[in-house]
Design a protein with these regions (language model features):
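Membrane-interface helix-loop junctions and terminal tails of multi-pass membrane proteins
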Residues: 1-84
């Protein structure tokens, strides 16, 4: 899988865990996401972490924008599922 798909799925797990299950499930979902996708994408799964790595110089501007787009799309998808 590409890093962007991994970021999308990891963020989807993290936000879904927080919205539908609470903090403990969110932490468990984050641990699962990092275990399965951390080596592919770096395991950011959070726009703040991605922005930090961009400011630190670890990510290019293009890669940062793609990561952020994947993370925001995952968050929006959880929002729309929640509103159903």
């Amino acid at each position: 899988m590409t890093p962007f798909v991994v970021e999308f799925l990891g963020t989807l797990l993290l936000v879904s865990g927080g919205v539908f299950g609470g903090p403990l499930l969110a932490v468990a979902a984050l641990a699962i996401a990092i275990a399965f996708g951390g080596k592919v994408s770096g395991g950011h799964f959070n726009p703040a972490v991605t922005f930090f790595h961009y400011m630190k110089g670890d990510l290019s501007q293009t890669k940062t924008l793609w990561y952020l787009a994947a993370q925001y799309c995952a968050g929006l998808l959880v929002y729309f599922i929640y509103k159903l």
